[in-house]
């Protein structure tokens, strides 16, 4: 990044690097902190070795994420870096962290990342800083500086922050606060800015995207938002974290009628059995799962369906698990993520009886993965012999183009790997769309040949 503030050019300032753990919501926070520091004249990047201040933006959703965050904190403090801990762990353990890890120089909560420059200035003066609000309330809009890596051609656009649901297994409402939506004008403005920077795909995110607008408009307003975003000149707009309750006829119609909103439905259903869903404090969902999935497939035959599931939830027995397997066979999702229940202190599920033994939960996870691999392979093989549109994101050492069609989301799904007969300079492909013929498919990826650039 370049320094924007010429007034600080001659000052001795910190070189700040970022280490990021966790979800894309955390990534957006990191990008805003980078943008804010850049505006203040700091040298900002990802080169830990060259930096004297390292901001570790942490995740605290499950134990493994906390362990990874702690490892990074220890690694960087051992290197003599001034470490500032931001994000969900700072919010979760705002009192304990500074006591148990006195080598940490500062904390920045999930609703306080806009204060990062002030925090670093105080750390530079030798202060130990705890900048963590009790209840996160802030959400950045398009006016808050943000560094977006244009080399990736994909950007996440946060439409709301926080969550008002109280799912039994989830700590996020305590870490991210209540839902607070941005207004439609703000979101559209940022989308236009991203499109002007050459972003080819915008992914809408929040804790529950289908609840967007409930807090500011008095009712869920995703359909209104999508109607306005469909006018933005960006090839692909993708929606993550859509819950069944918010997939109204109007929302589904927005997918169907738009040219740039891809028919990709990310539905974190977690389970299928009514008893388990009730224990998860999602009793409303069981009656909707079947009807919503059928409705999507009927109205949008080209729809791609992804879900995430939890196995080993307290009280889940073989009957419940078999119900889930039957559900998967019946609906044949294109993509499935499966996780083993992680008991998190501070959630209502933490004290639930009838814990599932770890070896049983592991076996159930493996069972689902095996079943889904067969389904995904069958689904992918339907593309063999067809022509598809692919966004090229990188080039392999073998001069193969690697990208995605609309049915693959970045990071979590597969890739499309393409050979090309007359290879030219990579700048002719990266960040551009090509038309490709698919020749082969496995359970994860598609393989084919480039027909032409688009």
UniProtKB/Swiss-Prot annotation:
It is found in: Cytoplasm. Residues 381-452 form the TRAM domain. It catalyses: L-aspartate(89)-[ribosomal protein uS12]-hydrogen + (sulfur carrier)-SH + AH2 + 2 S-adenosyl-L-methionine = 3-methylsulfanyl-L-aspartate(89)-[ribosomal protein uS12]-hydrogen + (sulfur carrier)-H + 5'-deoxyadenosine + L-methionine + A + S-adenosyl-L-homocysteine + 2 H(+). CDD domains: Radical_SAM. Its EC number is 2.8.4.4. Belongs to the methylthiotransferase family. RimO subfamily. Binds 2 [4Fe-4S] clusters. One cluster is coordinated with 3 cysteines and an exchangeable S-adenosyl-L-methionine. This is Ribosomal protein uS12 methylthiotransferase RimO. GO terms for biological process: tRNA modification. Keywords: 4Fe-4S, Cytoplasm, Iron, Iron-sulfur, Metal-binding, S-adenosyl-L-methionine, Transferase. It comes from the Bacteria. GO terms for molecular function: 4 iron, 4 sulfur cluster binding; aspartic acid methylthiotransferase activity; metal ion binding; protein methylthiotransferase activity. Residues 149-378 form the Radical SAM core domain. Catalyzes the methylthiolation of an aspartic acid residue of ribosomal protein uS12. Residues 14-125 form the MTTase N-terminal domain. [4Fe-4S] cluster 1 binds at residues 23, 59, 88. One of its GO terms (cellular component) is cytosol. Its cofactor is [4Fe-4S] cluster. InterPro entries: Elp3/MiaA/NifB-like_rSAM (IPR006638), Methylthiotransferase (IPR005839), Methylthiotransferase_CS (IPR020612), Methylthiotransferase_N (IPR013848), Methylthiotransferase_N_sf (IPR038135), NA-bd_OB-fold (IPR012340), Ribosomal_uS12_MeSTrfase_RimO (IPR005840), rSAM (IPR007197). Its main location: cytoplasm. [4Fe-4S] cluster 2 binds at residues 163, 167, 170.
């Amino acid at each position: 990044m370049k320094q924007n503030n010429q007034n600080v050019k001659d000052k001795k300032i910190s070189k700040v690097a970022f280490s990021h753990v966790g979800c894309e919501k955390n990534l957006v926070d990191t990008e805003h902190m980078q943008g804010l520091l850049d505006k203040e004249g700091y040298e900002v990047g990802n080169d830990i070795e060259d930096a004297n201040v390292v901001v570790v933006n942490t995740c605290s959703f499950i134990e493994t994420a906390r362990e990874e965050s702690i490892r990074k904190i220890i690694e960087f403090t051992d290197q003599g870096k001034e470490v500032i801990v931001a994000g969900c762990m700072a919010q979760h353990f705002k009192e304990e962290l500074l006591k148990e890890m006195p080598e940490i120089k500062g904390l920045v909560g999930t609703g306080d990342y806009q204060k990062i420059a002030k925090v670093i200035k105080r750390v530079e003066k030798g202060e130990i800083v705890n900048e963590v609000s009790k209840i996160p309330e802030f959400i950045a809009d398009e006016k808050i500086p943000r560094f977006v890596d244009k080399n990736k051609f994909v950007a996440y656009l946060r439409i709301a922050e926080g969550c008002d649901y109280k799912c039994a297994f989830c700590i996020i409402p305590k870490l991210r606060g209540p839902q607070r939506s941005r207004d439609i004008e703000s979101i559209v403005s940022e989308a236009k800015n991203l499109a002007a920077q050459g972003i080819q795909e915008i992914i809408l995110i929040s804790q529950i995207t289908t609840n967007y607008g409930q807090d500011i408009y008095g009712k869920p307003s995703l359909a209104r938002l999508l109607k306005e975003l469909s006018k933005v000149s960006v090839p692909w707009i993708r929606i993550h974290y859509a819950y069944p309750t918010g997939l109204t006829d109007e929302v589904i119609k927005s997918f169907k009628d738009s040219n740039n909103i891809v028919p990709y439905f990310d539905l974190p259903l977690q389970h299928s059995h009514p008893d388990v869903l009730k224990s998860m404090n999602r009793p409303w969902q069981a009656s909707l799962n079947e009807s919503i999935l059928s409705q999507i497939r009927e109205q949008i035959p080209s729809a791609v369906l992804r879900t995430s599931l939890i196995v080993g939830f307290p009280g889940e027995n073989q009957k419940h698990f078999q119900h889930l397997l039957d559900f998967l066979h019946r609906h044949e999702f294109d993509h499935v993520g499966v996780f083993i229940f992680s008991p998190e202190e501070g959630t209502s599920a933490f004290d639930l009886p009838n814990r599932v033994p770890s070896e049983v939960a592991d076996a159930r996870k493996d069972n689902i993965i095996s079943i889904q691999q067969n389904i995904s392979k069958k689904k992918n093989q339907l593309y063999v012999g067809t022509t598809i549109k692919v966004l090229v994101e990188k080039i392999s050492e073998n001069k193969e183009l690697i990208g995605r069609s609309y049915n693959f989301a970045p990071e979590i799904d597969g890739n499309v790997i393409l050979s090309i007969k007359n290879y030219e300079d990579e700048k002719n492909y990266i960040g551009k769309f090509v038309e490709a013929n698919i020749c082969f498919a496995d359970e994860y990826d598609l393989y084919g040949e480039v027909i032409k650039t688009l």
